[in-house]
């Protein structure tokens, strides 16, 4: 497998069918079970149930055993289209299915799938028969709670997660990846490296510790340097903005449920979930000419979104975060060159973080059925994105009809060291937000008439917090030298050499490196072990010989030790940092 997150339709179908087999097994083992929904998801599937009694992970082997028993029947998956009346009668004892049926449009086809003794309301597709499901190619993973339809006012259901693969060896490979992913979990490593913590009483908000904040600022300053080189102007917009702005932008109608809302002086305000309306407001200040375009406004924008507590995950999914956000205001003629420029910037930045071109996937989302603008405009916009990818040497897969209603977009996904995929960067064309119907941004064209600019929404990293989580897991906490919050620790072999260790620290500090002299009372071996656990890449051991020769014994993270003069180590580390070297050796 090229990546463990298999996207093929065939594998998704297999997983969906395995979910049905699991549902049949659960119904067999727990009579009276009410079944809800059971889709295929990334890496596997799940099914939600209302069970007659609580179950836990100890029950999973029995369910797996029943599933394998069902598979021996080699039953076919048979589709049948039925009337609404028949569906309501068939599922009269299944309240969740009845609710789904009643919620379907009057003209929508209602289909069921039969397999063995189990019948489910389902659109499909499915494999032909249970013989297509390898009895050793699936595993039930865990049990969790899930509110019906994600609504905390509705019943809490039991969700059983599983994974399914075409071959047992694929399953084995996936489970090995999960084991390695557990070791690389950013929450575990973040704690070991003393980077951050999250308070149980304040979920979704990060407390950055000194080392973690150093890492954060290193990334932020790197991005700031790159975008300045690329002609962006950095701005800052208010964290709290009035309801009237969100209504005009369209976010109030489409995004209100995800916004934190407050009231002051009988007016409603919202903590911003995104930065785009604020950037349009900046563009609108003063008269703009076509000569001012393209105008590139960038912001490390603090955003807050009211994410359900159950969806929060470390620093990967949080409520308060900062985006490396930017919006480019340009003419239609400038779209292609601006997107090309952005793609080149994105490739360079990803490479510096250790993601080469073959670790970048690009999805090109084209016009949806419901959209604004005429076909000629969409033709030009889509061609501009396609040409930009070609200019940057980026191959893409087309996602037909998945563009936003206001314009097509490119989405950039990174493949990490375990083959997992993380969607990070994006660039979207927007004809709607600057329009007269929304925020009415205008410039004076070369014809002396007013025009609305095209707006390009773009980000490279996305959420800085989430990207840091991705980096931690990608490199197992062992950051490249330029990123490491602590680039070197000086460890004296005995207290007699503390003064020399502090001298080395001062010299390295003056050169701009992030170093610590560990002159604590622990024994040398304990110090070395501690800094190894904290993922420090260079430990500089100093004793009598090093002090006499103005040198350091450089203990490499991957093993081995090399004596260098202090000047040699400075040159060595400077070269690693300046070249954005990924390998510390």
Swiss-Prot record:
Compartments, as annotated in UniProt: Cytoplasm
Catalytic activity, as annotated: tRNA(Thr) + L-threonine + ATP = L-threonyl-tRNA(Thr) + AMP + diphosphate + H(+)
Keyword set includes Amino-acid biosynthesis: no
Region (Catalytic): 185-480
Chief place where the protein resides: cytoplasm
Cofactor note: Binds 1 zinc ion per subunit.
UniProt-annotated binding residues for Zn(2+): 276, 327, 457
Essential cofactor(s): Zn(2+)
Any single biological process term in GO: threonyl-tRNA aminoacylation
Signal peptide: none
PROSITE patterns in the cross-refs: AA_TRNA_LIGASE_II
A single GO molecular function term of this UniProt record: tRNA binding
SUPFAM superfamilies: Class II aaRS ABD-related, Class II aaRS and biotin synthetases, ThrRS/AlaRS common domain
An annotated GO cellular component: cytoplasm
Entry's EC annotation: 6.1.1.3
Alphabetic keyword roster: Aminoacyl-tRNA synthetase, ATP-binding, Cytoplasm, Ligase, Metal-binding, Nucleotide-binding, Protein biosynthesis, RNA-binding, tRNA-binding, Zinc
Homology family: Belongs to the class-II aminoacyl-tRNA synthetase family.
Oligomer and partners: Homodimer.
Protein name: Threonine--tRNA ligase
Organism: Treponema denticola (strain ATCC 35405 / DSM 14222 / CIP 103919 / JCM 8153 / KCTC 15104)
UniProt gene name: thrS
């Amino acid at each position: 497998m090229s990546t463990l997150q298999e996207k093929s339709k065939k594998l998704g179908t297999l997983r969906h069918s395995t979910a049905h087999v699991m549902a049949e097994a659960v119904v067999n083992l727990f009579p009276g079970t009410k079944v809800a929904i059971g889709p295929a998801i990334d890496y596997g599937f799940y099914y939600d149930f209302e069970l007659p009694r609580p179950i836990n992970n100890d029950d999973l082997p029995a369910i797996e055993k029943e599933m394998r028993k069902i598979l021996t029947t080699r039953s076919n998956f048979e589709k049948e289209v039925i009337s609404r009346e028949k569906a309501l009668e068939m599922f009269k004892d299944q309240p969740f299915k009845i609710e789904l049926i009643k919620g379907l449009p009057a003209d929508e086809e209602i289909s069921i799938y039969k397999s063995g003794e189990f019948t489910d309301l389902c659109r499909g597709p499915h494999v032909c028969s249970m013989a297509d499901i390898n009895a050793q190619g699936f595993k039930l993973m865990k049990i969790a709670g899930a509110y019906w339809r994600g609504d905390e006012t509705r019943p809490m259901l039991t969700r059983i997660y599983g994974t399914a693969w075409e071959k047992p060896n694929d399953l084995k490979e996936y489970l090995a990846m999960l084991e390695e992913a557990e070791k690389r979990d950013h929450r575990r490593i973040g704690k070991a490296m003393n980077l951050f913590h999250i308070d149980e009483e304040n979920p979704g908000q990060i407390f950055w510790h000194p080392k973690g904040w150093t890492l954060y600022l290193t990334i932020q300053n790197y991005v700031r340097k790159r975008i300045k080189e690329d002609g962006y102007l950095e701005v800052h917009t208010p964290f709290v903005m009035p309801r009237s702005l969100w209504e005009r932008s369209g976010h109030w109608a489409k995004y209100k449920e995800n916004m934190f809302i407050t009231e002051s002086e009988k007016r409603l305000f919202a903590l911003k979930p995104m930065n785009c309306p604020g950037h349009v407001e900046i563009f609108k200040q003063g008269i703009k000419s076509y000569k001012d375009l393209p105008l590139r406004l960038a912001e490390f924008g603090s955003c807050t979104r009211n994410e359900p507590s159950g969806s929060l995950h470390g620093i990967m999914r949080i409520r308060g975060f900062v985006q490396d956000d930017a919006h480019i205001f340009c003419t239609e003629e400038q779209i292609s060159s601006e997107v090309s420029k952005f793609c080149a910037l994105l490739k360079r930045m990803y490479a510096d973080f250790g993601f080469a071109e073959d670790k970048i996937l690009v999805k090109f989302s084209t016009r949806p059925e419901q959209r604004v603008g005429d076909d000629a405009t969409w033709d030009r916009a889509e061609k501009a994105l396609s040409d930009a990818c070609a200019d940057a040497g980026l191959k893409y897969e087309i996602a037909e009809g998945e563009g936003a209603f206001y314009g097509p977009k490119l989405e950039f996904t990174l493949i990490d060291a375990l083959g997992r995929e993380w969607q990070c960067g994006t660039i979207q064309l927007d004809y709607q937000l600057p329009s007269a119907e929304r925020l009415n941004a205008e410039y004076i064209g070369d014809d002396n008439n007013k025009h609305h600019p095209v707006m390009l929404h773009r980000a490279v990293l996305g959420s800085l917090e989430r990207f840091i989580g991705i980096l931690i897991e990608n490199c197992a906490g062992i950051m490249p030298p330029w990123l490491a919050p602590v680039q070197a620790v000086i460890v004296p072999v005995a207290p007699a050499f503390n003064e020399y260790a502090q001298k080395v620290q001062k010299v390295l500090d003056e050169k701009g490196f992030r170093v610590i002299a560990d002159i604590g009372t622990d024994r040398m071996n304990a110090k070395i072990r501690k800094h190894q656990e904290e993922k420090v890449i260079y430990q500089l051991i100093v004793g009598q010989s090093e002090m006499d020769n103005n040198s350091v014994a450089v203990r490499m993270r991957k093993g081995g030790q090399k004596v260098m003069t202090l000047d040699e180590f400075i040159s060595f580390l400077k070269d690693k940092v300046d070249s954005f070297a990924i390998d510390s050796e």
